[in-house]
Swiss-Prot record:
One of its GO terms (biological process) is threonyl-tRNA aminoacylation. It is an enzyme of class 6 (ligase). The gene is thrS. HAMAP family: Thr_tRNA_synth. Keywords: Aminoacyl-tRNA synthetase, ATP-binding, Cytoplasm, Ligase, Metal-binding, Nucleotide-binding, Protein biosynthesis, RNA-binding, tRNA-binding, Zinc. It comes from Haemophilus influenzae (strain PittGG). This is Threonine--tRNA ligase.
Length: 643
């Protein structure tokens, strides 16, 4: 007679073992109809699963995050059901959930077209509309293998052979005539899977191994209701408009080419933004008492072996040889900073030493993962390393956290998710060292009153870290900043200081990055601002234009006046209508357009318009210069009279 304890603390007693759905029915018909699955003693179970002993139970519905994930997982099965009906010879591989959706890897002897995807989606909807029940059956390992052998599913057989114990009882989910294997849980009825959209097809190797066969990966998104789906698709449309690759090309910021995959060719305007970011960060380095250094971008293999990178990071490092010596191009700056620290005797009185670098790093990322500025092979880190005593950890990490929020707020990022990543399986250093490092970061977060999520096993191989993820205007998260404790690397590279008792001690090293990769950060803010950079970042801050040739000299004079006070200004003296010029520079997202006609010349003024079409009236050149200088100096996000 199981006693079921519900989330509100109430209990229900049953005479016999009872399913999750039967408990929901006992509570009420409305809840039963909404039941997708249940959390029994904290673990997710199908609605049909039987509870035999006393347990806690939380009913999962479409309103829960878990419920939405289950809907998406079941939509992957629905995709399998539909494609198997349309293409009976297709071989099914895996179909997991991902953020906002799902995918299924399939093996088909021809490439799927958009027409095929449309047909699959149509068939999925037709099947879902029949509201059929999903039937779960536990079978022996051999029964499962026999089932998939008869159905001609080699990938399912491989999963059984390689990933599932012979003593296990796998769950098979029956979707009418279609059968899939999964840990579950899944929806009890396809009425929950009505709001989805297939999005694209991409290539994916079986098991993620390039030595294996290339499969076709069909991506889709699924939501609990029509409104959620529509809102998500609208966000996708907006994201496509804001794609930094598209905007970067339109604004002539940079380009990439086959001869240098993952490497950025910065054009003048893009490089202007890059340098402005560096200048801004430098002002903060001075404010927070950092010294700026520059290390070599290539060092001998011997050094990388000492640090542990050669053993733990070799696949991502570019290497070369010269005069019988093997070198690695640095994937990160930290070993070089330790070498600088090691030059000359250091005392505890010298600590903390805060060492910063705009370091040019290279990582041999897989070609398939490269994506515009967001995932590159060559990048610049706004990197810093702080050498300190254990007693200084909390205050130094606190200072880093303050600096992170200080810098992010300048760009308008105030919604920041904080995550603490703990020790990975593949790591260096003792457990005791990791205990101290993780406790130190947790203490600093607590001291600053920050809520954070723990990411088990996601730390770097040399230390735990705090990650700062920016949430942009579309609700996406971008992990940029990190603060990482390292008790291991200084010792490996023989870094010491003279302690107060005259003994030699190893300093603690704090790795700190805020923008992360400057390239990637430019990609992020390009999409956040949709290319409408604030005046201080805009490559061209104002364009001065004439109406007729008679104003050309005045235009040149105004432009020189503004340039002389440090503003980035261009002239447009083309023999085109002024409306055409305004439209063109509006498309180029230039913050201000200054029009000079005979009236403006007579008054010694300029007529000012913004890129959003606002007519600000006329100003003397001195007045406008002061306004724009103040906006640049204070790094304002908005233009004049802009909401």
């Amino acid at each position: 007679m199981p006693i079921i304890t519900l989330p509100d603390g109430s209990q229900r007693q049953f005479d016999n073992p009872v399913s999750v759905l039967e408990v929901a029915q006992d509570i009420g018909a409305g809840l039963a109809k909404a039941t997708i699955a249940g959390r029994v003693n904290g673990e997710r179970h199908d609605a049909c699963d039987i509870i035999e002993q006393d347990a806690t139970l939380e009913i999962i519905t479409a309103k829960d995050e878990d419920g939405l994930e289950i809907i998406r997982h079941s939509c992957a099965h629905l995709l399998g059901h539909a494609i198997k009906q349309l293409f009976p010879d297709v071989k099914m591989a895996i179909g997991p959930t991902i953020e906002n959706g799902f995918y299924y890897d399939v093996d088909l002897d021809r490439s799927l077209t958009q027409e095929d995807i449309d047909a699959i989606e149509k068939r999925m909807l037709e099947l879902a509309k029949t509201n059929y029940d999903v039937v779960k059956k536990r079978v022996t390992w051999q029964e499962a293998r026999d089932t998939f052998e008869k159905r001609g599913e080699p990938y399912k057989m491989a999963i059984l052979d390689e990933n599932i114990e012979r003593t296990a009882m796998p769950a098979l989910y029956h979707h009418l005539e279609y059968i899939d294997m999964c840990r579950g849980p899944h929806v009890p009825n396809m009425r929950f899977c009505q709001h989805f959209k297939l999005q694209k097809v991409a290539g994916a190797y079986w098991r993620g191994d390039s030595k294996n066969k290339m499969l076709q990966r069909i991506y889709g998104t699924a939501w609990a209701d029509k409104k959620q789906l529509a809102e998500y698709l609208t966000r996708l449309e907006e994201a496509a408009k804001r794609d930094h690759r598209k905007i970067g090309k339109a604004l002539d910021l940079y380009h990439m080419q086959e001869e240098a995959p993952g490497m950025v060719f910065w054009h003048n305007d893009g490089w202007t933004i890059f340098r402005e970011l560096e200048t801004f960060v430098r002002t903060k380095l001075k404010q927070y008492d950092y010294q700026e250094v520059k290390g070599p971008f290539m060092m001998d293999r011997v050094l990388w072996e000492k640090t542990g990178h050669w053993q733990n990071y070799a696949d991502l490092m570019f290497t070369t040889q010269s005069e019988n010596r093997e070198y690695a191009i640095k994937p990160m700056n930290c070993p070089g900073h330790v070498q600088i620290f090691n030059q000359g005797l250091k005392s505890y009185r010298d600590l903390p030493i805060r060492m910063a670098e705009f370091g040019s790093c290279h990582r041999n990322e897989p070609s398939g993962s490269l994506h515009g500025l967001m995932r590159v092979r060559g990048f610049t880190q706004d990197d810093a390393h702080i050498f300190c005593t254990e007693d200084q950890i909390e205050s130094e990490v606190t200072s880093c956290i303050k600096m992170v929020y200080d810098i992010y707020s300048t760009f308008g990022f105030t919604n920041i998710a904080v995550k603490l990543s703990t020790r990975p399986e593949n790591r260096i250093g003792s457990d005791e060292m990791w205990d101290r490092a993780e406790a130190g970061l947790a203490a600093a977060l607590a001291h600053n009153g920050l809520e954070y999520e723990i990411q088990e096993g996601e730390g770097a191989f040399y230390g735990p870290k705090i990650e700062f993820a920016l949430r942009d205007c579309l609700g996406r998260e971008w992990q940029c900043g990190t603060v990482q404790l390292d008790f291991a690397l200084p010792g490996r590279l023989d870094a010491t200081y003279v302690a107060e008792d005259n003994s030699r001690k190893t300093p603690v090293m704090i790795h700190r990055a805020i923008l992360g990769s400057i390239e990637r950060f430019i990609g992020i803010i390009t999409e956040e601002y949709a290319g409408f950079f604030p005046a201080w970042l805009a490559p061209t801050q104002a364009v001065v234009m004439n109406i007729t040739d008679s104003q050309a000299d005045y235009v040149q004079k105004v432009a020189k006046q503004l340039s002389d006070v440090g503003l980035r200004v261009k002239t447009d003296l083309r023999n085109e209508k002024v409306g055409f010029k305004i439209r063109e520079h509006t498309l180029r997202r230039v913050p201000y357009m200054l029009v000079c006609g005979d009236k403006e010349i007579a008054e010694g003024k300029v007529a000012v318009r913004t890129r959003k079409g606002a007519d600000l009236g006329t100003f003397t050149v001195e007045e406008f210069a002061e306004i724009l200088k103040n906006q640049v100096r204070s790094r304002e996000l908005k233009l004049l009279n802009e909401e």
